């Protein structure tokens, strides 16, 4: 098992992944494991420090989440965040109670001990993000207050001699202005970690692992046109001789305008052989008459398996199947369930369908989405392909409200292409996290020239986000939106109205279906 400098024990917080991402961004390799991880497995990773995440439970509840008691005897530095702070307080003899006033949102942190290494070069007063219903009432012996807020007299505590620290706030959330700095201080000055983690070193390590795993056997790699599968293919191409890699691209007719051609051009540029299967007709037949979003997903998934299985059957000498499983998928498949979100086993995690006998190759299962993009650039993939906005697995099918047909896809593709052109020309494409159009199953009356029209409505959706878990609608200048609307209505026959979605997530989701 590889050495992990910082290990995060997950107690169910919606923010847990952010802890690992913030530390990795600063060059410190970090992994997330369930809070119930055994002390043997923790020791096997040889961590230099442990972080206890937040979570939805109460430490004084009968069924409270508790880590393996052995972690307290390792002598390692520990940082507790929110629920993690309450665990530390309780374990060392302090007391925790339900707070009179729940504290949610921004608060001002005042540092009481500027000499504490956790606060090295951190501003004495800064904004932090609180999200808790319980609080420490009495500190354990040996602990001191190192930070306070208006409603939290124990906002940050420390036992400097034991190298144990605890925050009532969430340093990992971007609203905590100095939070990343505090996490880096914990890793660097308290745990002694070095900033050696980067995509260059990861790529070399992973390429060596692929060569050792695959040997001289063949690998089948399904390519969707998305960033993840393209990066997987590029990494396999770097690791293996050309004759050992079989890349298959199923064109299901649900991609954005010219996207299938762009995928094929990219693989030519990278000199990676690509088998393209034109399955548009089969997918359209499978979607005929289907209007329910979940039924669309099911129909697309079943048809993809059928088409891919048929192609896989032609390659009887293949031993491995490559998948674009991400670290997010791995974490969520074993994560603690909490009220913040429903965690389910991801489609890329947990094995293969019964009909497949391949061994899996998953070169991305240790990294996050933003790291995948950095890895793609490291491997030489074109920036315009790596920087594309997220695109759903079922493709345009879930951006057509109602039945999917060729005419609906035409309207959607053309409107989406115009919107993207306008965003790029005005410099807003890279300023939003995701932007797309949705074809609504709504028609309305309009007037074009002297004629009455009764045509389709398109919704423009643009959001700002860090990771897609939460999102706010993008505040795009009206003249940019007006330009998008004018071009869509004037250039696409069949659309006479454009609306802008100003919903945030939550309560809405980013995609409409």
UniProtKB/Swiss-Prot annotation:
PROSITE patterns: GATASE_TYPE_1 (PS51273), GMPS_ATP_PPASE (PS51553)
Domain GMPS ATP-PPase: 197-388
E.C. numbers: 6.3.5.2
Reaction catalyzed: XMP + L-glutamine + ATP + H2O = GMP + L-glutamate + AMP + diphosphate + 2 H(+)
Catalytic residues as annotated in Swiss-Prot or TrEMBL: 82, 170, 172
A Gene Ontology term for the protein's cellular component: cytosol
Top-level EC class as recorded in UniProt: ligase
Assigned keywords, A-Z: ATP-binding, Glutamine amidotransferase, GMP biosynthesis, Ligase, Nucleotide-binding, Purine biosynthesis
Pfam families: GATase, GMP_synt_C, NAD_synthase
Pathway: Purine metabolism; GMP biosynthesis; GMP from XMP (L-Gln route): step 1/1
MF-aspect GO terms: ATP binding; GMP synthase activity
Residue numbers binding ATP: 224-230
Residue stretches making up the Glutamine amidotransferase type-1 domain: 5-196
Main function: Catalyzes the synthesis of GMP from XMP.
Quaternary structure note: Homodimer.
Protein name in UniProt: GMP synthase [glutamine-hydrolyzing]
Higher taxonomy: Bacteria, Pseudomonadati, Campylobacterota, Epsilonproteobacteria, Campylobacterales
């Amino acid at each position: 098992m590889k050495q992990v400098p910082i290990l995060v024990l997950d107690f169910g917080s919606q923010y847990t992944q952010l802890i690992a991402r913030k530390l990795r961004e600063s060059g410190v390799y970090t992994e997330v494991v369930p809070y119930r991880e055994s002390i043997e497995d923790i020791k096997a990773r040889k961590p230099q420090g442990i972080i206890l995440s937040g979570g939805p439970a109460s430490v004084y509840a009968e069924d409270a989440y508790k880590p393996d008691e052995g972690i307290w005897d390792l002598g390692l530095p520990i940082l507790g965040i929110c629920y993690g702070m309450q665990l530390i307080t309780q374990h060392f003899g302090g007391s925790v109670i339900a707070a009179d006033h729940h504290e949610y949102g921004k608060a001002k942190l005042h540092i009481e001990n500027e000499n504490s290494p956790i606060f090295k070069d951190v501003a004495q007063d800064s904004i932090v993000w609180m999200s808790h219903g319980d609080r420490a009432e009495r500190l354990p012996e040996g602990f001191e207050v190192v930070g306070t807020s208006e409603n939290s007299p124990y906002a940050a505590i420390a036992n400097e001699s034991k190298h144990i620290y605890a925050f009532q706030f969430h340093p990992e959330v971007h609203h905590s202005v100095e939070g990343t700095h505090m996490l880096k201080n914990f890793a660097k000055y308290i745990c002694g970690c070095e900033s050696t983690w980067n995509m260059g070193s990861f790529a070399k390590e992973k390429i060596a692992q692929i060569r050792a795993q695959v040997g001289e056997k063949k690998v089948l790699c399904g390519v969707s046109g998305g960033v993840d599968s393209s990066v997987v293919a590029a990494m396999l191409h770097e690791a293996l001789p050309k004759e050992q890699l079989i890349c298959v691209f199923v064109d299901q007719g649900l991609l954005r305008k010219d996207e299938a051609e762009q995928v094929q051009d990219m693989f030519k540029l990278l000199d990676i052989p690509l088998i393209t299967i034109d399955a548009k007709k089969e997918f359209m037949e499978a979607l005929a008459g289907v209007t329910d979003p979940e039924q669309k997903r099911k129909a697309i998934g079943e048809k993809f398996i059928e088409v891919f299985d048929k192609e896989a059957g032609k390659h009887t000498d293949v031993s491995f199947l490559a998948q674009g499983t991400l670290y997010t998928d791995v974490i969520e498949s074993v994560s603690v369930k909490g009220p913040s979100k429903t965690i389910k086993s991801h489609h890329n995690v947990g094995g293969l369908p019964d009909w497949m006998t391949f061994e899996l190759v998953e070169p991305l299962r240790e990294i996050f989405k933003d790291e995948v993009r950095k890895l793609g650039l490291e491997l030489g993939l074109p920036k315009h392909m790596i920087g594309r906005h997220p695109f759903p697995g079922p493709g345009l099918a879930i951006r057509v409200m109602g039945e999917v047909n060729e005419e609906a896809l035409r309207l959607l593709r053309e409107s989406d292409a115009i919107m993207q052109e306008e965003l790029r020309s005005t410099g807003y494409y890279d300023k939003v996290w995701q932007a797309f159009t949705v074809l609504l199953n709504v028609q309305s009356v309009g007037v074009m020239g002297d004629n009455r029209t009764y045509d389709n409505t398109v919704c423009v959706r643009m959001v700002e986000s860090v990771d897609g878990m939460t999102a706010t609608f993008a505040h795009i200048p009206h003249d940019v939106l007006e330009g998008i609307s004018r071009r869509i209505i004037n250039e696409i026959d069949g659309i006479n109205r454009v609306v802008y979605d100003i919903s945030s997530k939550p309560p809405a989701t980013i995609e409409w279906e």
